[in-house]
Curated annotation (Swiss-Prot):
Domain of life, source organism: Bacteria
Membrane topology, from the record: Lipid-anchor
Protein name as it appears in the record: Uncharacterized lipoprotein YkyA
InterPro entries: Lipoprot_YkyA-like, YkyA-like_sf
Localization terms from the record: Cell membrane
Organism listed in the record: Bacillus subtilis (strain 168)
Keyword flag Cell membrane: yes
Pfam families per the UniProt record, alphabetical: YkyA
Signal peptide residue numbers: 1-25
Lipid attachment, kind S-diacylglycerol cysteine: C26
């Protein structure tokens, strides 16, 4: 393999390292209190999301190590190449499982947030209503960014699968391998872009929510 490839996939460990929502306590029953309660439930629903991100980062690091090990070998070590590629394929499968769990967490959060939007519609205080709408706008953009990022990550995992299947092929050409690596690189570059957008909207949402809570008289716990 040393003669077959000079580059490696541009896998960025922590590409999914997004920022967590800020949690506070919850209260009451009027529209503002109901909004507050629903927002906190949405944040609580994302705890598994944060846990899965950590697991995915660990798996990404292990996959990088496997890739590096394969690239140090040549075709005289074909059996080792196959064994390492199989381990990498198992790693990709695990990442698919954890990515699904992460996505499930975000879907639950989004469901809770829809309830928050309903509560916001009944707020009569103009200043609080404007701040609630601003927070909702950033949160909706955040969910959209995550959805795009999730789809691209799934695509990247499929491309990784194909890469490791190719590495087990004795007849693999340099051109075919380079083309697949380019596809993996391009996919991970998109993930980084979407991750940045997601993190930006998370920061804006957290700030908008702080403003909302300040206006409504809630204490915001920073973490």
């Amino acid at each position: 393999m040393k003669d077959a490839i000079k580059r490696r996939p541009g896998i960025k460990i922590g590409a999914f390292c997004a920022m967590a929502l800020i949690l506070t306590g919850c209260m009451g029953q009027d529209p503002v209190d109901s909004l507050h309660h629903s927002l906190e439930k949405a944040a609580e629903s994302e705890k598994p999301f944060q846990e899965e991100q950590n697991t995915l980062k660990e798996l990404e690091a292990k996959e990088n190590q496997l890739y590096d090990s394969v690239m140090k070998l040549n075709m005289d070590d074909y059996k080792k190449i196959v064994a390492l590629s199989n381990k990498a394929l198992e790693n990709v499968s695990k990442r698919e499982e954890h990515l699904k769990l992460e996505n499930d967490s975000m879907k639950k959060s989004e469901t809770e947030f829809e309830e928050a939007k309903t509560s916001a519609e009944h707020i009569k205080e103009k200043d609080i209503k404007e701040k609630a709408d601003a927070a909702a706008n950033h949160m909706e953009k955040r969910y959209t960014s995550y959805g795009t990022m999730y789809k691209e990550y799934k695509k990247a995992l499929e491309l990784n699968k194909k890469l490791y299947m190719q590495l087990k092929d004795k007849d693999l050409t340099r051109d075919d391998l380079d083309q697949q690596i380019d596809k993996v690189n391009a996919s991970y570059e998109k993930i980084l872009k979407y991750s940045g957008e997601f993190n930006e909207q998370t920061e804006k949402y957290n700030k908008a929510r702080e403003d909302l809570y300040d206006a409504a008289g809630y204490r915001v716990k920073k973490s």
